[in-house]
Amino acid sequence: MKNRLIGLCIVCACCLMAKADDLKLWYQQPAKVWTEALPLGNSRLGAMVYGGVVNEQIQLNEETVWGGGPHRNDSPKAFGVLPKVRELIFAGREKEAEKVMADNFFTGQHGMPFQTIGSLMLEFDGHADYSNYRRDLDLERAVASVRYKIGEVNYTRTIFTSLVDNALIIRIEADKPGAVNFTTRYSTPYKEYEIKKNGKNLLLSGHGSAHEGIPGAIRFETRTQIKAEKGKVNVTNDCIEVKGADAAVIYVTAATNFVNYKDVSANETRRATEFLAKAMKRPYAQALTAHEEAYQKLFGRVSPVSYTHLRAHETGRNL
C-alpha cells in the first residue's frame, strides 16, 4: 500500500510539472531575427522580445503609428466615368475599359503602412559567459521571461504588456544582492527623432515617415522610467544606467496624436505621460497580478482543442 501511495505521488508530481509547461513556448537560445522573438501585446502596445543576454532588444509597436497621414485616396473622377466603363465592358471592349479605369480610378496612394516606434535596448556588461539559458512565453499568463546564470548568480527578466496599466513592464532581478547592473537606450529607424532626458524619464519622440507623397503626420512619444530596489539609477540625455541594484523594474509607455483617420490633433506627450504615471502608481507584484487577472478573463473563455505537442518540449526543436 505504501509503495502504491509513493507511486501515485510521483505520477501526480509529473503531471503537475507537465501542466506547468503545457502552454509555454520555450527556447534555449536568444532570437537571432525578428520572427524568432517572442510577441507580447495588449491590443494597443506591442513588443517583440529577443531574449539577448549581453544585448537585449525589445522592439516596440503602438497601434496608431503609421506612415503618411489623413488624405483622400479615392479618385473624384471615378464616378463620372463609371457609365463609360460599363458601356465599354458591355460592348466587349475590356481593354479600353481597363485603360479608362487606370486613368481615372486610381490616385497613386494605396494606403498607409504600419510602422514601428523602434526598440528598447538593454546592455548587460560582463554577461557574455553565461549558462543555463532559457527564454519562454507563457500563453496562459501573457508573460515572457528570460533566465540564465553568470558564475554563481542567477538572473531573471519578466516582461509583460499590461492590459490594465497600458504599459510595457520589465522586471530584472538576481539572486545575489547588488548584482543588477545595466544600461537602457532607444534605437529607432527614423531619420528625424529626438531622445532626451525629461526628469526621471528617458524620452523618444518622432513622427511616421512620408509615404507615396503624403507627409508623415503621426507623431509619437515613448517614455521610459526605472524603479530600482537599492542601487542607483542615473538618467542622461541618451540612456538610463542602473548600478548595484537587487532588482529593477522598467516601465515603458507610448502614445500618438491619432484620434481617428481624419483627425491627428491629440497630444501624444500628455497621453504618454498619463499612461506612465498610472502604471508607476501600482507596485510591481500588484501590476503583474492585475494584468494576469484581466488577461484570464479573455483567455479563459476558450480552451485549446489540443496542445499536447507543446508539452515538455523545446519549441524551437519541435514546431
What are these regions (language model features)?
Residues 1-21:
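Bacterial Sec-dependent N-terminal signal peptides
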Residues 286-306, 310:
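An acidic-aromatic substrate-binding cleft motif
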Residues 40, 80, 167, 247, ...:
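Generic recognition of stable, solvent-exposed alpha-helical segments in well-folded globular domains
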Residues 21-169, 173-182, 187-192, 196-199, ...:
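Accessory carbohydrate-recognition regions in carbohydrate-active enzymes
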